[in-house]
């Protein structure tokens, strides 16, 4: 099997056993990039020579007999809003194009410490908001890959990278994962540091992972989950044996609750039929849940927090380069400047209250099942799709994952979103793995 087809765990194991060299792995992905990048446009920065040099260094380290990190020799793609000291960080805007930083992001530092090779930077929408970059969907180049982690999802879907790092402030991991037919995992808020990452909102920004297996989600999470003094949201979380723990069988089959959310009316008819079929397959393991009326307010609360924070955090771009930023971003910043402080305070105060109400479900169920998107990836590249099926879970800081289980009428991927209890990510991933195995049979 060609190296680019292997999972991250398989690649690491083969390199450590000397069945593959890191250079072999790098060359396999380089060939793939050279074949498909001209159509997918997943990369904001990729330097073949530098990638091969890093792979050679990884091989030299291994052959010297020195201890190997858990991700030794693994290529990882990074969304172009994470600072890297040896590559430019452009944030998806010409304002920052080609600029470099000496203050590397904590996620990148942890990946390197674990032995990973940062292979390049993936395309993001403009300043991680809605105005799209150049990336296309690998399943259909005429369709959007979603956003804002467009390039990260597309690179994994096109087998140009085994895993990739992205971020989500509303639906920027789950949505592109669904559209591109890969696994996209957003851990609980506070597990992964945002230090050295373009900030939109302290309360909403969350780091995510793209890959092809649940095991790889556990493997990468174990490397980058860490308390960080530079990010006050982070906490200590046990990650020992996380990559194997997520694969363990439940002592009994997990129970799921199906949540339509108030946006169910916006789900296209084909997707509704697909989810009806899914519920029938899981009939012994799933029950329906009546959305509480408080769910409706979450969409307003999330928008108030996100846009108010963007008005503050992106003020440099707005004040110095207003004519160089997109219309959607400019309008969001201007709305953020207009909200009243009491409305912002109400939106913030309700995060904990609404989560407490929601968490009662987990006394009876292992996880929530809900759509990831309103349907297949939309035609055209100007619109990255609606994040509305992700909004509630991002606002509440709950772990969520998009699983490539369903298919739309145009044979495009359709993700199933699974949502778990806050800070119970291992059990949540175990439930997601059970679901993936059962429905992929």
What does each model-found stretch correspond to?
Residues 71-207, 261, 372-384:
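Short glycine/serine-rich loop/turn segments
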Residues 1-53, 343, 441:
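An N-terminal boundary/leader segment
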Residues 35, 113, 158-163, 169-262, ...:
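Structural helix-boundary/capping segments
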Residues 11-17, 96-99, 205-212, 334-339, ...:
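Short, well-ordered beta-strand elements within core beta-sheets of diverse protein domains
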Residues 357-360, 383-404:
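Small-aliphatic-rich amphipathic alpha-helix that forms the alpha element of a beta-alpha
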Residues 71-91, 250-255, 259, 301-355, ...:
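Short helix-loop capping/hinge segments that flank enzyme active sites or metal/cofactor-binding pockets
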Residues 22-27, 269-290, 315-320, 344, ...:
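Acyltransferase
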